[in-house]
Amino acid sequence: MLIDVNSSEAILLNLVNGNADVVGDPTRKAIQDGEYGRIPRRELDQLIDRKYLFSNSDAATSYVQSVEKSLIAQMEELPPSFVYIPSYSCNLNCYYCFEKAYDHDTSLPDQGSCSSAKAFLMALKTIVCSFEEAHRTELDPKDISVTITGGEPFIPENYSAILTLLKGCRNLGITPSFVTNGYFLEPFLPILKEFGVSDIQITLDGSKPIHDSIRITKAGDGTFDQIVRSIEALDEFAERLSVRINATKKNLPSIADPSFSKLINEYPNVFFYLYFMQQEGCADRKNVLNELEGLKTALRIQECCSDLKNLDISYHGENIVRPIFGHGAFRPKIAMCAAMSNQYIFDYTGRIYKCWWGMGNPDYQVGDFSMSGHSINRKLESPYRLRKVTSIPKCSRCRFRLICGGGCTGRLSRQDFSLGRTICPDFESILPFMVRHLYQSGENHARA
């Protein structure tokens, strides 16, 4: 991909291996015209060495296929990862909650919730042991991810189940992470400290007036002040505390409020980031921003408000853009996420799922578990495991496939998912815009 960054330079971006190089105007024009003989020999050799150019189309195809084959093998070696839902009950009533897209049981957990937590831990151990036997390896417990979410995990009725999970995970050498709204954290703080929980995500949707119109209690009360108190408490011991701002048409302008940037700067060790919502509750999209326009708006606000420099902006394609400017390494994706590999989601009702978007929906169930054991229906699981860019016709023809990994399946129906349909980000617009923006704003450290 050739991206003009000014009148005399372009960045040549390899969409397979992530290599990026600044080229001058003569080379840019030669590449655009397909007349590679006009490129100086030394520079041409560099382009060949870095896999931009090949002697023929068969050599190019062979290289891409070898990369994809390696990625498939690597994906099969990924350690199992787990999500547990102690209940679907929540103390908030956010209009955009994706769990509102379908009906499921939001009643408070009963006395059986601890038994379900214990059954989950048993299943986790069995799955890990089976993986180790199949791959003839011994996993480091630190490489096994367990995320506890909901609903809302930190409601009073979940306390016993959370304690059971923390004890069980510690016995296995695992420290779980949590996704929470942060509203009712205080009673849980002592056990979170005791068990060394350091990875927690909270959501805060803009300045206080806007947040308090979006993330409200069931009674309609605002939650901003209470969540900020939770951030303050967690900042004392949670080393990987992140605060997500779900950006929509409703709240994006509010990040320009000076009080919001002041809040961000009060907690320099906390990772605050913008995430552009893809859909709202019941699959509505009336407040969903076009991602490119959202990026432009967010960056304009950030440029005008210097105090917002610590606010990160998440976007599709950042996995290849950020490494160009020295932030991390590009990791091509043969599939979208861990749901296409060894991720399993367990809920307190005894059901097992693969994808976050399907949890709580029986139509997306792939197995069940209890104190007697667990069972995974391989036929129901297979569409996930088989979904790779090499097996989706549209993806196999797309040059962005190893950036995207086939796209998120969460918004697809089960039938569309099985048919290999896709929902594609606008990489054709987003990548040039972000590369150009970062280069022109001074992060011109593209690898040469």
Identify the role of each PLM range.
Residues 2-22, 41-83, 137-139:
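N-terminal [4Fe-4S]-dependent radical SAM core
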Residues 7, 357-448:
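Flexible mid-to-C-terminal extensions adjoining Fe-S/redox cofactors in radical SAM and related proteins
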Residues 8, 339-342:
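Short loop/turn microsegments at loop-to-beta-strand junctions
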Residues 76-122:
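Canonical Radical SAM [4Fe-4S] cluster-binding loop centered on the CxxxCxxC motif
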Residues 86-93, 340, 395-397, 401-402:
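Cysteine-centered iron-sulfur cluster-binding motifs in ferredoxin-type domains/subunits
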Residues 109-114, 213-221, 414-415:
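Short glycine-enriched, charge-decorated loop/helix-capping segments at active-site entrances
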Residues 120-149, 156-277:
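Radical SAM/AdoMet-radical enzyme domain recognition
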Residues 213-339, 348, 362-364:
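Radical SAM enzyme [4Fe-4S]-AdoMet core and its adjacent flexible, acidic
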